[in-house]
């Protein structure tokens, strides 16, 4: 098991390292997104792949020697085994407790979003929740959440709406949910936290890029 954990950490480190070396500064944002998604799957599947090799075993003469093991040695061995603490079991308990806490935290965050109380409207065929309290605009799954101050004269600030609409359209929430689940079960992997930040940053760049393109198109049409 320890070998698999080390392989997972190594693979995710390599995938992330290659991203920083060759893709982080490139404008291939859509490619970057799928590279990170496939890289995540690769990092957590390859370590479980084993290649069996057949070894030719030559028959060698076996010399059998009967020897009686002193009773005192057997008793001492049994006593030592009984007194030895099972650290493996303790580590398993720690692992599942931390994973359980992270899963509970993720579910609580989702529940908190879903129970946000606000005015629901359909704006340009998108579900929008208008909240009285001040929040930074965000989207989750197929819904956009923003403060009422961005909704004036039956219109939402164009740039903000387009930005969040792109997150919804490109289903960025599923990427985030995936990385959160992976993080919950592999919290021991130091690279997974950098991986999450890289994915979210790439989502923001993707949305900004699409907003610029759409705003230019709208400006051309209006002129």
Predicted regions and their residues:
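A Zn2+-metalloprotease active-site environment signal
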Residues: 170-200
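Active-site scaffold of zinc-dependent metalloenzymes
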Residues: 129-154
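Divalent metal-coordination and catalytic microenvironments
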Residues: 36, 95, 142, 163, ...
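Membrane-water interface at transmembrane helix exits
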Residues: 19, 23, 104-112, 167, ...
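Active-site recognition of the HExxH zinc-binding catalytic motif
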Residues: 158-179, 207-208
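Hydrophobic membrane-embedded segments
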Residues: 1-14, 23-25, 29-103, 108, ...
């Amino acid at each position: 098991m320890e070998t698999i954990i080390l392989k997972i950490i190594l693979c995710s480190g390599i995938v992330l390292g290659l991203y920083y070396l060759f893709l982080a500064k490139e404008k291939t944002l859509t490619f970057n997104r799928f590279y990170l998604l496939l890289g995540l799957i690769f990092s957590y599947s390859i370590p479980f792949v084993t290649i069996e090799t057949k070894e030719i075993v030559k028959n060698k003469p076996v010399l059998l020697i009967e020897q009686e093991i002193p009773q005192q040695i057997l008793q001492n061995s049994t006593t030592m085994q009984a007194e030895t603490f099972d650290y493996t079991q303790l580590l398993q308990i720690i692992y599942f407790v931390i994973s359980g806490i992270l899963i509970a935290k993720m579910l609580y965050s989702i529940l908190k979003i879903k129970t946000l109380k606000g005015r629901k409207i359909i704006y340009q065929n998108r579900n929008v929740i208008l909240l009285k309290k001040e929040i930074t605009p965000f989207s989750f799954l197929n819904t956009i959440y923003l403060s009422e101050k961005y909704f004036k004269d039956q219109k939402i600030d164009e740039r903000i709406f387009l930005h969040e609409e792109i997150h919804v359209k490109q289903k960025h929430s599923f990427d985030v949910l995936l990385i959160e689940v992976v993080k919950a079960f592999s919290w021991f992997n130091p690279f997974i936290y950098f991986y999450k930040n890289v994915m979210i940053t790439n989502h923001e760049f993707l949305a900004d890029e699409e907003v610029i393109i759409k705003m230019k198109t709208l400006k051309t049409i209006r002129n």
